Amino acid sequence: MARKGLIQRERKRQKLEQKYHLIRRSPKKEIGKVSSLSDKWKIHGKLQSPPRNSAPTRLHRRCFLTGRPRANYRDFGLSGHILREKVHACLLPGATRSSW
């Protein structure tokens, strides 16, 4: 189980990303339209003004049950070992068992 502080930090990042989504998106569109280098630097400065944690690349997908940030399956929202336990317990329909 992940520490509660890490999960709260991730939720805070998700809220920041939603808040600054439009502010980040508009300068990215402008950079492609502008041809002069000085204008691109000005737009780049605007892009750096939002907080660092509002960038979507700083988000992790976490396991729905344990909060584990690695080895997640997007289709289920679960980490690998939890997914395996659920499949062996026949709680996920359509998934085939495997052993390793």
UniProtKB/Swiss-Prot annotation:
Recorded GO CC terms = chloroplast; small ribosomal subunit
Q: What's a GO biological-process term for it?
A: translation
Q: Which UniProt keywords apply?
A: Chloroplast, Plastid, Ribonucleoprotein, Ribosomal protein, RNA-binding, rRNA-binding
Give the range the annotation lists for the signal sequence: none
Q: Main subcellular localization, coarse class? A: plastid
* Compartment(s): Plastid, Chloroplast
Keyword Isomerase recorded: no
Pfam families hit by this protein: Ribosomal_S14 (PF00253)
Q: Tell me the GO molecular function terms.
A: rRNA binding; structural constituent of ribosome
From which domain of life does this come? Eukaryota
Q: What does this protein do?
A: Binds 16S rRNA, required for the assembly of 30S particles.
Describe its assembly.
Answer: Part of the 30S ribosomal subunit.
Family in the record: Belongs to the universal ribosomal protein uS14 family.
Name of the protein: Small ribosomal subunit protein uS14c
